[in-house]
Amino acid sequence: MEEELAMLRQLIGQLQELLHNGSPPPPSSSSSLSSSSPSFLVLHHPQYQNGWCLPCIEDTSADDCCDIVMAGGKRPGIFKMLETVKPPVKRTRKERTQGKSCTEVDEISGNMDQEIWQEFPQDLFEDVVSRLPMATFFQFRAVCRKWNALIDSDSFSRCFTELPQTIPWFYTITHENVNSGQVYDPSLKKWHHPIIPALPKKSIVLPMASAGGLVCFLDIGHRNFYVSNPLTKSFRELPARSFKVWSRVAVGMTLNGNSTSHGYKVLWVGCEGEYEVYDSLSNVWTKRGTIPSNIKLPVLLNFKSQPVAIHSTLYFMLTDPEGILSYDMVSGKWKQFIIPGPPDLSDHTLAACGERLMLVGLLTKNAATCVCIWELQKMTLLWKEVDRMPNIWCLEFYGKHIRMNCLGNKGCLILLSLRSRQMNRLITYNAVTREWTKVPGCTVPRGRKRLWIACGTAFHPSPTARA
């Protein structure tokens, strides 16, 4: 019996030690511990809501202790209320450093930071940084030279390339400010005003296509091509073409792989069927002949509609006959699809969402005008309407002559620029979530807000894309 009493005292001592060190006692959950039992005391007081009781066994026998533990209620026992001990609370840095000198605190913090961060894995660091929002990433680069040099790191470039692509940005030229571009970031709903110093200042240069974070520019005289990353100012002037084309041309761009490190291709095609392909790896234009004879010449392209790229294939919109012209950058094959457009349609352009080919246009009946979205059905080669702008927004266009420009060549986000004599609107449409969002006006430097986009292209922002 003495051994049992000693073990019980040891148990009580351990519990008291736990209480003294700050560990919370287990809550009383047994229904037998009630106020009706003389051997146990349960206090219900605001000050002791978490209080609990232990028997005082200094003056009791082992039998009494066993009776208390095993047969509560048969014999009276003496109890001692222990002071309520709250769970440990995390102290603030000010409380932890209270009473220490500034030198001691700085030494502790410095040693702690050095010990933690000097062993931080570089691959994990790059993996975290690659997931930062683009605007935050460029602020992050200003911290030190090492972080600024990340965009030149091959491992960081691979890490960034493996991430799923985010919603695209839009490089635009406003109607009255054709000498500089404005970039819209839909995630922040903010306009940026990048400067690409290498672009010629004396001629008008327009954005024509994009791939992998790079934007392809063409001067208004159709003489020179340029490729640049608007975020990092990486720039390349493409070599002169093998022959001059003075007519209007359509321009498309694709990647050779999943990033610009594998190279990219640029295609231009003229109305008479002539075309050339530029490969960044060889840095030359290749003349691959003319469009096959089974495709009607002249090629009447809808130049308001930008070509869209799905994998390695470019799609152009035809006006006569109505349909789509495609070119595979890998196989070099042209195809033509006769696809009649929806009736009462105007200002229509192609758009892409993943592997889906979309059509965006103005549908006008009587005096009512609305923006509609169609998707090409691959089995029937017919356009199927999948969405249209909310009616309350369409009412703004009632009785007005509306014109529209559309940028939707990358990602699943489409930027619409709508104007009439009385109004201008900028709107984005998400083809995945089917959300319509109004876009704030673009404030041109030293100018007022502009709500009309003359031309532009969508592109996926990339800090690692190199021209």
From Swiss-Prot:
Q: Which SMART domains match?
A: FBOX
Q: Where is the F-box domain?
A: 114-163
Q: Which domain of life is it from?
A: Eukaryota
Q: Where are the Kelch repeats?
A: 163-211, 252-305, 406-456
Which UniProt keyword terms apply here?
A: Kelch repeat, Repeat
Q: Which Pfam family is an annotated match for this chain, by its short name?
A: F-box
Q: Tell me the Gene Ontology biological-process terms attached to this UniProt entry.
A: leaf vascular tissue pattern formation; regulation of auxin mediated signaling pathway; simple leaf morphogenesis
The record's listing under PROSITE patterns reads: FBOX
PANTHER family under this entry? BNACNNG10540D PROTEIN, F-BOX DOMAIN-CONTAINING PROTEIN
Q: What is this protein called?
A: F-box only protein 6
Which organism is the protein's source? Answer: Arabidopsis thaliana (Mouse-ear cress)
